[in-house]
From Swiss-Prot:
GO molecular function: P-type potassium transmembrane transporter activity; potassium ion binding
Name listed for the protein in its UniProt record: Potassium-transporting ATPase potassium-binding subunit
Keywords carried by this UniProt record: Cell inner membrane, Cell membrane, Ion transport, Membrane, Potassium, Potassium transport, Transmembrane, Transmembrane helix, Transport
Quaternary data: The system is composed of three essential subunits: KdpA, KdpB and KdpC.
Family according to the record: Belongs to the KdpA family.
Length: 567
C-alpha cells in the first residue's frame, strides 16, 4: 500500500461526488420531460419514435401495466439475441466465418444480456461475428441499462408522488433515457476510447508476422462503441475474452481510470435524482453516504489484502504484493479498485483475474454481490436495491421507537416490508441453493478446476454473480456446459425479475398513499444516525445470510494458506 495508491482512490471518490449533482440535475430534467440543451436536436427524434410506435407520452401507466410492458420488452430482446446467434453463420459482417452458436449457449447469452448480467461462457473474438456483437449485444446493452434506470425512476415516483395510481410510462422512460442520457455520453465516450487506442472498425482481422516469423491473427472489430456502453450501462460483457484486461479494450492507465468513473457515474447521479424528486436533496446524499461507507471499506480491505500478498509468498521471500493475474500497466491499486467497483456496481467487467486474488481480496467482490450490489449498483438497479434496504431500516427504526415507520412522507407498512423482504430473500435462495447443487452434482463438479475451499468459492462466485446480474467470474470454473448454461440462466432470470416485480409493487403502493408532513416524532433520514442504521441493517442481513458460505470458502482458504496449505 502506497500514498500514490491511496491518492488514486481518493481522486476517484472526489470526482464521483463532483459528478453526482450536475448529472442528477440533468437526468431529473430529462425524466420530468423538461427542456435540456439537447432538446432542439433530440426532441423531434423522440416525438417521431412515439408517433411510429403509437405511444402517447402523456398517458401514464399503473405499476402493473408498467411492469408488464417491461417484461414484454425483455421478451423481444431475448428473441433478437437468440435469433442472431443461432443464424450467425448466414448473416453478414462475419469476417472470421464464425458458425452458429449452440442452443444452450445462445439461451444463456440471451438471458445474460437482457438481464444486464453479461455473463459470458464464450470468448467474443473466437465465437461471435461483428453483427452479433453490434445488433445483439451492444444494442441490448443500451436497452437493458435504460430499463434499469426507467425502473428506478418508477420507484422514485412512488416515493415522490401522492394519491395517484400511476408511476410513469415505461416506453417514454426507456426512450428518454436512451436518447438523452446513454447515446450522447456514449458518442463522446467512444471517441475518447478510440483516441486511447481501442479499435473501431468493420474490417477483417489483421494478419501479422511476429519477430520469430510466425503468423498471428489479431482480432479487431467495433470494440470502442461496445466498451463505452458496457461500462456506462454497467453491463460488463467484453468484446474480447480477457475483457478490460485486454489492451484493445483498456489500453492505458487513463482509459482504465475513465472506465472506472463511468461505471459509477450514473448510479451515483440517481441518488441525487431521488433527492430532487422527493423535494430534499439531502435524502439523496444520505443514500450516497451509505453507499460510500460500504465502498471505501471494501476498497481498503481488498487493497490491503492484495498489497500484503500471502504467507506462501512471504515464505518464498517475494515482496511487492500479489501481482498474479494483474496487468502491470494497472498495478495493484487500479486492479483492486476496479474489482471492488465492478462488483459494487453490478458491472462485471474485469481488468484483472479475480480468481487469482488472495482469499480475502477475492472475498470482498463476492460480498459486494451477495449484498445485492447496492453500493451504487447497476444503473437503476443499485438504487432500487438500496431503497429496499432503506425500507427495512425505517421499519426497524419504527419498531424501536414504537411509531408507524415513515420515509420521505410515506408510511412504510406491512405490504412494503413484505415486498422488500421477498426481493431480498430471492437472491440468497438462488445462489446458495444452486451452489449446493453445483458442489455435489457430478456434471457440475467436473467443471471445477480446483478442489477444496477455492473450488467451492468458484462455484459460489459463479451463482452469486449470475443471481446478482454482475457477470464477473472466478474463471477457473468451466461454465460452457449444459448444466451451467441452464442453471446460470435461471439464476440470472430470477435475480433480475423477482427483484423488479416486488420493487414495482412497492412503487405502486407508495404512489397511492397520501404524503404525511414530518412531525416531532419522525425519524430523521438525512443524518449520520440514519446512515449508520442502514449500514447496520445491510451488514446484519448480509452477515446472517452469507457468513456460513463465506466461512466454507474464502475464510477457511485464508486460514489454510496461513498454515501452509494451498489449493
Amino acid at each position: 500500500m502506497t500514498m500514490i495508491g491511496w491518492l488514486q482512490i481518493i481522486l476517484f471518490c472526489v470526482i464521483i461526488v463532483a459528478l453526482t449533482k450536475p448529472l442528477g440535475w440533468y437526468m431529473t430534467r430529462v425524466f420530468n420531460g423538461e427542456r435540456t440543451f439537447l432538446s432542439p436536436v433530440l426532441r423531434p427524434i423522440e416525438a417521431g419514435i412515439y408517433w411510429i410506435s403509437g405511444v402517447d407520452e402523456r398517458r401514464e401507466q399503473h405499476w402493473l401495466t408498467y411492469t408488464v410492458a417491461m417484461l414484454l420488452f425483455h421478451v423481444g430482446g431475448f428473441l433478437v439475441i437468440y435469433g442472431v446467434m443461432r443464424l450467425q453463420a448466414v448473416l453478414p459482417f462475419n469476417p472470421a466465418g464464425q458458425s452458429a452458436v449452440a442452443q444452450d449457449l445462445s439461451f444463456n447469452t440471451a438471458i445474460s444480456f437482457i438481464t444486464n448480467t453479461n455473463w459470458q461462457n464464450y470468448g467474443g473474438e473466437s465465437t461471435l461475428s461483428y453483427l452479433v456483437q453490434m445488433l445483439g449485444l451492444t444494442h441490448q446493452n443500451f436497452l437493458s441499462a435504460a430499463t434499469g434506470i426507467a425502473l428506478a425512476m418508477a420507484l422514485i415516483r412512488g416515493f415522490s408522488r401522492a394519491s395517484v395510481r400511476t408511476v410513469g410510462n415505461f416506453w417514454v422512460d426507456v426512450t428518454r433515457c436512451t436518447l438523452y442520457v446513454l447515446l450522447p455520453i456514449c458518442v463522446v465516450y467512444t471517441l475518447f476510447l478510440v483516441w486511447q487506442g481501442i479499435p473501431q472498425t468493420l474490417g477483417d482481422y489483421v494478419e501479422a508476422t511476429t519477430l520469430e516469423g510466425a503468423k498471428q491473427t489479431i482480432a479487431v472489430g467495433p470494440v470502442a462503441s461496445q466498451v463505452a456502453i458496457k461500462m456506462l450501462g454497467t453491463n460488463g460483457g467484453g468484446f474480447f475474452n480477457a475483457n478490460a484486461a485486454h489492451p484493445f479494450e483498456n489500453p492505458t492507465a487513463l482509459s482504465n481510470f475513465v472506465q472506472m468513473l463511468s461505471i459509477f457515474a450514473l448510479g451515483a447521479a440517481l441518488t441525487n435524482v431521488f433527492g430532487r424528486m422527493v423535494g430534499n436533496q439531502r435524502q439523496g446524499w444520505a443514500i450516497l453516504a451509505v453507499m460510500g461507507v460500504l465502498f471505501v471499506a471494501g476498497v481498503a480491505v481488498t487493497y490491503w489484502a492484495e498489497a500484503n500478498g500471502t504467507s506462501t509468498m512471504h515464505a518464498l521471500g517475494l515482496t511487492g504484493g500479489n501481482m498474479e493475474g494483474k496487468e502491470v500497466r494497472f498495478g495493484l491499486v487500479a486492479s483492486s479498485l476496479f474489482a471492488v467497483i465492478t462488483t459494487a456496481a453490478s458491472c462485471g467487467a474485469v481488468n484483472a483475474m479475480h480468481d487469482s486474488f488472495t482469499a480475502l481480496g477475492g472475498m470482498i467482490p463476492l460480498i459486494n454481490m451477495q449484498l445485492g450490489e447496492i453500493i451504487v449498483g447497476g444503473v437503476g438497479a443499485g438504487l432500487y436495491g438500496m431503497l429496499l434496504f432503506v425500507v427495512l431500516a425505517i421499519f426497524v427504526a419504527g419498531l424501536m421507537v414504537g411509531r408507524t415507520p415513515e420515509y420521505v412522507g410515506k408510511k412504510i407498512e406491512a405490504r412494503e416490508v413484505k415486498m422488500a423482504m421477498l426481493a431480498i430473500l430471492v437472491l440468497p435462495l438462488m445462489y446458495l441453493g444452486w451452489t449446493a447443487v453445483g458442489v455435489v452434482y457430478p456434471a457440475a463438479v467436473a467443471s471445477m478446476a480446483n478442489a477444496g475451499p477455492h473450488g467451492f468459492t468458484e462455484v459460489l462466485y459463479a451463482f452469486t454473480s449470475a443471481t446478482g446480474n454482475n457477470g464477473s467470474a472466478f474463471a477457473g470454473l468451466t461454465g460452457n456446459t449444459l448444466f451451467y448454461n441452464l442453471t446460470l440462466a435461471s439464476a440470472m432470470f430470477v435475480g433480475r425479475f423477482f427483484m423488479i416485480v416486488p420493487a414495482m409493487a412497492i412503487a405502486g403502493s407508495l404512489a397511492a398513499k397520501k404524503s404525511i408532513p414530518p412531525s416531532a416524532g419522525t425519524f430523521p433520514t438525512t443524518g449520520g444516525l440514519f446512515v449508520g442504521l442502514v449500514v447496520g441493517v445491510i451488514l446484519i442481513i448480509g452477515g446472517l445470510t452469507f457468513f456460513p458460505a463465506l466461512a466454507l470458502g474464502p475464510i477457511v482458504e485464508h486460514l489454510a494458506m496461513n498454515a501452509g496449505q494451498v489449493f
